[in-house]
């Protein structure tokens, strides 16, 4: 049996073939650490924990990297409000998220790089893009030339001309093209900054991930993952940067999980419709959140409400009730039948998981087996 993965880049399921036989390199975008994490963040972490666990079950050696964005406008704003250093804010919420990962029984990543730890490499990456004509400095900032990269828009399916139409008003006149994006931002009073050839400043969000992925996993990776809200502009821009730097396809497979929804809308800090991981774990066990995800398709939106939580709790209870010695009731005939059913259940499990990690079907087969 071969594993098939839905690739956002091709918009279809593809046979899974790794760059190096038996090994998987996987980069998953982590949180921007400026506030308490919510169950939407947990969903992405759990989805790729499930992916990793299955790949390892199938015999692959997985190197899994998840980053922390620890320099960002939102972190800086939070620090100003509290009157503390931005690194104090970042460390506070990194520590909290690390604990949440343990509470949720998520396997530790191979590495957890931070943007501030890769500043030398980030500056070198920006300089390389300038040297190759893909970027240009302007008044202390550095911008990426989207028109220079012929594949821009291939992940999201957008065309530059169509995107430009939405940027007719309040366009930064320093940009050569309205869709050009910042690789480096010149320093502002009171903000953290680092010295660079273009003056003191800090990196843009997108270049951070390109560089962290490269320094941890190399020029090419097997899987790049994250929430589907990151497809554009973040992952689109990562492709443009990384492939411009190295002249190779960046990631073979782009995997995106759906969003956790509350009251019919994406769970978001900016909107305010969220449930923190802390508050969830005060009322429910961690396994219930994992079961909610297992009962659904990872690429689809997941509604968070009392009904879905209760359904997950009942499913857990059913599984736990089956965790006892299977004693045949009718002699050896029943034992042989049970063994045959267990073989078929495993085959169904593998077939479902090989089909783009179809955990919903997997759980269906598992519950059918539990009934026996």
Question: Over which residues does each language-model region extend?
Answer:
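Alpha-helical recognition segments enriched in aromatics with Gly/Pro capping
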Residues: 1-34, 49, 120-327
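N-terminal, positively charged nucleic-acid-binding surface of large information/translation enzymes
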Residues: 10-13, 19-105
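Short catalytic-loop micro-motif centered on adjacent basic/acidic residues
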Residues: 64-65, 110-113, 224-226
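Short, glycine/charge-rich beta-strand/loop segments that flank catalytic centers
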Residues: 68-72, 94-97, 107-122, 140-149
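Short, polar/flexible loop-turn hinges at active-site or ligand-entry regions and domain interfaces
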Residues: 82-88, 109, 299-303
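Active-site pocket-lining segments that scaffold enzyme catalytic pockets across diverse folds
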Residues: 97, 102-108, 126, 130, ...
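Helix-loop elements that line ligand-binding/catalytic pockets
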Residues: 302, 308-372
């Amino acid at each position: 049996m071969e594993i098939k993965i839905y690739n956002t880049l091709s918009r279809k399921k593809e046979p899974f073939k790794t760059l190096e036989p038996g090994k998987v390199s996987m980069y998953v975008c982590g949180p921007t650490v400026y506030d308490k994490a919510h169950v939407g963040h947990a969903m992405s972490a759990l989805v790729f924990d499930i992916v990793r666990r299955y790949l390892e079950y199938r015999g692959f050696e997985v190197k899994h990297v998840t980053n922390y964005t620890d320099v960002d406008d939102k972190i800086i704003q939070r620090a100003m409000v509290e009157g503390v250093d931005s690194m104090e804010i970042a460390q506070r919420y990194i520590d909290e998220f690390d604990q949440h990962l343990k509470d949720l029984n998520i396997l530790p990543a191979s590495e957890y790089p931070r943007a501030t730890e890769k500043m030398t490499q980030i500056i070198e990456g920006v300089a390389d893009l300038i040297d190759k004509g893909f970027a240009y400095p302007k008044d202390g900032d550095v911008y990426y030339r989207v028109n220079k990269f012929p594949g821009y828009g291939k992940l999201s399916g957008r065309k530059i001309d169509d995107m430009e139409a939405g940027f007719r008003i309040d366009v930064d006149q320093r940009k050569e093209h309205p869709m050009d994006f910042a690789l480096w931002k010149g320093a502002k009073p009171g903000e953290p900054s680092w010295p660079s050839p273009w003056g003191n400043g800090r990196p843009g969000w997108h270049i951070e991930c390109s560089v962290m992925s490269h320094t941890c996993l190399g020029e090419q990776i097997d899987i790049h993952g994250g929430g589907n809200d990151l497809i554009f502009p973040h992952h689109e821009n990562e492709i443009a940067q990384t492939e411009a730097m190295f002249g190779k396809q960046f990631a073979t497979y782009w995997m995106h999980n759906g969003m956790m929804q509350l009251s019919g809308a994406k769970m978001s800090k900016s909107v305010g419709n969220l449930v923190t991981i802390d508050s969830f774990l005060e009322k429910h066990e961690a396994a219930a959140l994992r079961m909610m995800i297992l009962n659904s398709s990872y690429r689809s939106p997941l509604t968070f409400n009392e009904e879905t939580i209760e359904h997950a709790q009942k499913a857990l209870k059913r599984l736990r009730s089956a965790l006892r010695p299977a004693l045949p009731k009718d002699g050896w005939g029943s034992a042989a039948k049970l063994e045959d059913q267990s073989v078929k259940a495993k085959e169904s499990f593998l077939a479902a998981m090989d089909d783009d990690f179809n955990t919903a079907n997997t759980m269906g087969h598992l519950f059918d087996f539990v009934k026996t």
